Swiss-Prot record:
This is Capsular polysaccharide phosphotransferase cps12A. Belongs to the stealth family. Stealth proteins are part of a protein family that is conserved from bacteria to higher eukaryotes. Family members were first identified in microbes as proteins that help pathogens to elude the host innate immune system. Microbial stealth proteins are involved in the biosynthesis of exopolysaccharides. Stealth proteins are predicted to function as hexose-1-phosphoryltransferases. Signal peptide: none annotated. InterPro entries: Stealth (IPR047141), Stealth_CR1 (IPR031358), Stealth_CR2 (IPR021520). Pfam families: Stealth_CR1 (PF17101), Stealth_CR2 (PF11380). It comes from Actinobacillus pleuropneumoniae (Haemophilus pleuropneumoniae). GO terms for molecular function: transferase activity, transferring phosphorus-containing groups. Its EC number is 2.7.-.-. Keywords: Exopolysaccharide synthesis, Transferase. It is an enzyme of class 2 (transferase). The keyword Transferase applies.
């Protein structure tokens, strides 16, 4: 009876809160690719942080951890000329969205993503930015001690250049000179949303985190929309099945990815023939391998080098009408001290766009970070 009285009192005094809580319980709000509602996010993040701090007290200093970004400025005339020269010869066999201009459009995301790492992850040893003979306008000499540009030709065999295929570029991350064994891979549309400890990515004993999504690859295929990422992940599963008894059906969350250089070397040793088979693909095709975002993380897991961990990442398409509400939510969460771990402001399909989608993104990033 007391419980009913409290509910009735809440209805009378704060009807808007009563109905909000009722609807949230009946229809939970989800912002992530995980099986958790918005009401659970803050508790999950707090629990992870407390556990990381306990581990910190019981371990020695972490090994070096680097960060790697891949970046392209699709508005660069030199890059456009190169793309126009090669792309027409490969478009016929390219995969869904592979030639969509949204994949190469630069909204200055890299500036915010890199500076978020510098602000919220000061323990990172070094940041490497992989480019195709390009340099971010904001990168000056004062940052060179912490940030190094890596050109495609520094790590990718010349016979595969130029390439406009991120899957190919990601297959050579381990070739970066002076890269640490443990590193975190970022696309430039992934942003750190709060302070994160090294233990969120790697334990002091070397075990990496693998941020697995609740999504299903088989259900994606059943929908009939065969993306290059889906095909490349399925191909990766077939390779993994040659060495392990697996039932993999889960992709990773769209966020940063902890990786190990030694696991890259193992993959090349085991799967060299399959790798060499897709490297000539200058655009994404349906016979690529999903290296950094799937093959290596799952290889690390089956080799006992990684274990599942939760990352609360808000994932959305910046051209979608839903982006506006997500921007407002991110800023509100920050004011409340309930920020997610990260967010991914994805841009891959230019067929439909809300007005001012770019300005909306930049305005939100400016308000969020205030760099």
């Amino acid at each position: 009876m007391n419980k009913m009285n409290r509910k009735f009192s809440k209805l009378l005094k704060n009807p808007h809160i009563f109905f909000r809580d009722f609807l949230n319980k009946k229809y939970p709000i989800k912002n992530t690719e995980l099986p958790f509602s918005e009401s659970e996010e803050a508790n999950l993040i707090e629990a992870n942080q407390k556990l990381d701090k306990i581990i910190q007290k019981n371990t020695l200093q972490q090994a070096n951890i680097d960060v790697v970004f891949t970046w392209v400025d699709g508005s660069d005339p030199s890059w456009q000329a190169k793309y126009s020269q090669y792309a027409p010869n490969y478009q016929a066999k390219s995969a869904l969205y592979a030639t969509d201009i949204a994949r190469f459009e630069d909204h200055n995301e890299l500036y915010y993503s890199v500076h978020a790492v510098l602000k919220y992850m000061p323990w990172v040893r070094h940041i490497f930015i992989i480019t195709d003979n390009q340099k971010p306008k904001w990168l000056d000499e004062t940052r060179q001690e912490k940030i190094t540009l890596i050109d495609h030709q520094d790590i990718i065999d010349k016979e595969y250049l130029p390439t406009f295929n991120s899957h190919v570029i990601e297959a050579f991350l381990h070739k970066i000179p002076n890269l640490s064994e443990n590193f975190i891979y970022f696309n430039d549309d992934v942003f750190i949303a709060r302070e994160l400890q090294a233990e969120h990515f790697f334990q002091a004993n070397g075990i990496a985190s693998i941020f697995v999504s609740e999504k299903s690859l088989s259900k994606m295929r059943d929908k009939g929309i065969i993306t290059p990422t889906l095909s490349a992940s399925e191909y990766s599963i077939r390779l993994l099945n040659k060495y392990y008894d697996t039932n993999i059906d889960s992709p990773l969350v769209h966020t940063y990815i902890p990786l190990k250089k030694s696991m890259y070397e193992l993959a090349w040793l085991r799967y060299e023939k399959a790798i060499l088979g897709f490297l000539p693909n200058k655009l994404r095709t349906n016979n690529d391998l999903n290296f950094a975002n799937f093959l290596i993380p799952w290889l690390m897991y089956f080799e006992g080098k990684a274990m599942p961990k939760i990352d609360i990442c808000y994932y959305f398409n910046i051209r979608s009408p839903n982006a506006i509400s997500l921007y407002k939510k991110l800023l509100l969460k920050q004011q409340m001290g309930e920020e997610p771990n990260s967010f991914c402001a994805n841009d891959f399909n230019s067929n439909y766009s809300i007005e001012n989608y770019r300005n909306n993104l930049i305005s939100t990033l400016n308000n969020y970070y205030k760099f």
